């Protein structure tokens, strides 16, 4: 079993970004809150929207930073320090270019894959990358020069449906992570692929 005390959904703040691919991590946290009848509330000392859940008998905090993506670490560190949460008790959900829509993967540790939100969290924790990552596939535009416009764009309805289905499965697998650990979660989540 894994001891997760903080689940973070990376996003850019503001209505103009709410439906963009880069906010997929926040979509996942929003779904977790909804499933447990909780409302995310803005808490300025944590630079984000927060909620508290009982997940499979565990006391878990949710956080969607209201900083811009490249300053996400400020919010995560503030909450981790306040509640004395270690990096390996944190799950960070984020959009992933290298995974197609309809697929989500989870891992512990690893690099940042050029993701500015992950980069900032790593630097704020003294480059200790040993936190869990939920990588929500958004696909790749095929040209690295188009990446910024792609992640800040809205997916078409067909892709959105697949991303939503992968997030739904990831939300179900979150409890498996807490009760049965990473290996079982990987087996189930990594075998899921939403149908177009």
From Swiss-Prot:
Active site (UniProt): 22
UniProt site positions, description: Stabilizes the basic form of H active site to accept a proton: 95
This enzyme's EC code(s): 3.1.1.29
Superkingdom of the source species: Bacteria
Residues given in the record as tRNA binding sites: 17, 68, 70, 116
Function: Hydrolyzes ribosome-free peptidyl-tRNAs (with 1 or more amino acids incorporated), which drop off the ribosome during protein synthesis, or as a result of ribosome stalling.
Assembly, per entry: Monomer.
Family that this chain belongs to: Belongs to the PTH family.
UniProt-recorded name of the protein: Peptidyl-tRNA hydrolase
Organism per entry: Serratia proteamaculans (strain 568)
Taxonomic lineage from the root: Bacteria, Pseudomonadati, Pseudomonadota, Gammaproteobacteria, Enterobacterales
Gene: pth
């Amino acid at each position: 079993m894994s001891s997760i005390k903080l689940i973070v959904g990376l996003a850019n703040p503001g209505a103009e970004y709410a439906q963009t691919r880069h906010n997929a991590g926040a979509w996942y946290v929003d779904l977790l809150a909804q499933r447990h009848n909780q409302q995310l509330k803005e808490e300025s000392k944590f630079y984000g929207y927060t909620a508290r859940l009982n997940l499979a008998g565990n006391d878990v905090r949710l956080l969607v930073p209201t900083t811009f993506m490249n300053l996400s670490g400020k919010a995560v560190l503030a909450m981790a320090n306040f509640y004395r949460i270690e990096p390996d008790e944190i799950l960070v959900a984020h959009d992933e270019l290298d995974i197609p829509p309809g697929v989500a993967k989870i891992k512990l540790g690893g690099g940042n894959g050029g993701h500015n939100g992950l980069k900032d969290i790593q630097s704020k924790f003294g480059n200790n990358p040993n936190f869990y990552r939920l990588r929500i596939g958004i696909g790749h535009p095929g040209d690295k020069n188009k990446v910024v416009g792609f992640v800040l764009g809205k997916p078409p309805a067909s892709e959105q449906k697949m991303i939503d289905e992968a997030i739904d499965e990831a939300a179900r697998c979150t409890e498996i992570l807490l009760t049965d650990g990473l290996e079982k979660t990987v087996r189930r989540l990594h075998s899921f692929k939403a149908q177009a």
